[in-house]
Amino acid sequence: MTSPSPRIQIISTDSAVASPQRIQIVTDQQTGQKIQIVTAVDASGSPKQQFILTSPDGAGTGKVILASPETSSAKQLIFTTSDNLVPGRIQIVTDSASVERLLGKTDVQRPQVVEYCVVCGDKASGRHYGAVSCEGCKGFFKRSVRKNLTYSCRSNQDCIINKHHRNRCQFCRLKKCLEMGMKMESVQSERKPFDVQREKPSNCAASTEKIYIRKDLRSPLIATPTFVADKDGARQTGLLDPGMLVNIQQPLIREDGTVLLATDSKAETSQGALGTLANVVTSLANLSESLNNGDTSEIQPEDQSASEITRAFDTLAKALNTTDSSSSPSLADGIDTSGGGSIHVISRDQSTPIIEVEGPLLSDTHVTFKLTMPSPMPEYLNVHYICESASRLLFLSMHWARSIPAFQALGQDCNTSLVRACWNELFTLGLAQCAQVMSLSTILAAIVNHLQNSIQEDKLSGDRIKQVMEHIWKLQEFCNSMAKLDIDGYEYAYLKAIVLFSPDHPGLTSTSQIEKFQEKAQMELQDYVQKTYSEDTYRLARILVRLPALRLMSSNITEELFFTGLIGNVSIDSIIPYILKMETAEYNGQITGASL
């Protein structure tokens, strides 16, 4: 060992001494400091002892160490007079780390404490996304979030996740990742796009503040934000950004075991169900975009377009659950309803486009409005779950309107115009009717929380947030008022019919015919309320005065809050024609055959 010239006289002991019996006191020749040296025999049988005097740069002057040769397997005897040990005390160590510690070699590499992955128990490589985990679970979690993957469990969602079985059930593995503290938002904020054109503009106008969320439509477990430029080149930011995933991370299962988002007890877990409507919407949107751009190179005749639509709706039909649905006959046939009446749509003559409806405008089948929530239910509320639930409600509302014979009698062009004009009102009525099933209050509270954080982070302008907050307040007020009135299924059905057959929208044809249908809906609602709630004289008036509030809600904000997570910059108006072109018999037949 190389060291400066010692300033302390070292006296070695005779190798024949069997035990540490001698204590020598030496004096520093310069300072006069007395140091006690304890000597002992090396148990390795070495003929000569090794006395090592630490350098002044060591742990401290005056430390004397007696150590066995490095090649010896015997224990090392450390003699020291430093402050951390009693002078003259013998400390027996067998590992090099302790020797290095006593020598003051703190910079020498030493064995690290082994940590284990909290998910599978394998050797951890560090803390990733908020939890100590191995490289395998780190990569699995990152892929699941970035690619928006969703999984299903073939068992009871309680599979054992360990080093050897972690790949058997991806659903339970991802679930355990979340339970052990891995954060989805950490994955999203880890990297930023390198494309400058995708960066958020600092001076974004309030009118263009929207969010478009990148989607893996095979299985959208969670939304990943991206900014999509409009046709005019304006980049947009918006309401549901990455922070939405932070502030909306509210457990869907309370501590007492009750579920916030109610689901149908008969519904079974189905793999990929969460993204089914997203696939349909995108198929229709892409087809619409191709047709609007005049790109017919890949879409030859109308037959191919029809087949694209049919395939899309086949997928849609399998996601819906209407056990009581039946194929609707054509308008020329009579329909026997459960109430015993029949509906006949009769045209007086070709020159007079007024149609008379014999029997009730709505049958008992139109009263049933059963929304099936996406399955499997995620443990934490996320943007795609909200958008998927809203999309199912929208499609269910349009299918409900499509099944009314009087509505079909108006013709395809009139149908499209009516639904485009009132889809937001129909959707809002559906929200009020299904508020408990969707846990609407939880969804709105999460959105409000996110908007409050957006104010602090200057992600949205004050005017834009004010508009959205007013819209949410109106929506919540409307739903609360409908719940307070305790509107039943018949009343909701007739209110939707009144909204659907509104003749005052601009650009409508056959306004006289539409007005007659609306009057009939109002009369039938009045008869029902008088018979069912005869003791409540003002009930009908209190119900009808709620309808004007629907016109005060912006369809653009509704679309932005509930649908951009799935369809991006594709408008609802562009999707409506394809939904209404589906043949009712084929549509209902697919639904009946695919009931969950």
From Swiss-Prot:
The organism of origin for this protein: Homo sapiens (Human)
PTM characteristics: Phosphorylation on Ser-19 and Ser-68 is an important regulator of NR2C2-mediated transcriptional activity. Phosphorylation on these residues recruits the corepressor, NRIP1, leading to transcripional repression, whereas the non-phosphorylated form preferentially recruits the coactivator, PCAF.
Annotated protein name in UniProt: Nuclear receptor subfamily 2 group C member 2
Keyword list, A-Z: Acetylation, Activator, Differentiation, DNA-binding, Isopeptide bond, Metal-binding, Nucleus, Phosphoprotein, Receptor, Repressor, Spermatogenesis, Transcription, Transcription regulation, Ubl conjugation, Zinc, Zinc-finger
GO molecular function, one term: DNA-binding transcription factor activity
Name of the encoding gene: NR2C2
Residues in NR LBD domain copies: 341-583
Zn finger (NR C4-type) start-end: 117-137, 153-177
Coiled coil (UniProt feature): none
SMART domains from the UniProt entry: HOLI, ZnF_C4
Compartments in which it is found: Nucleus
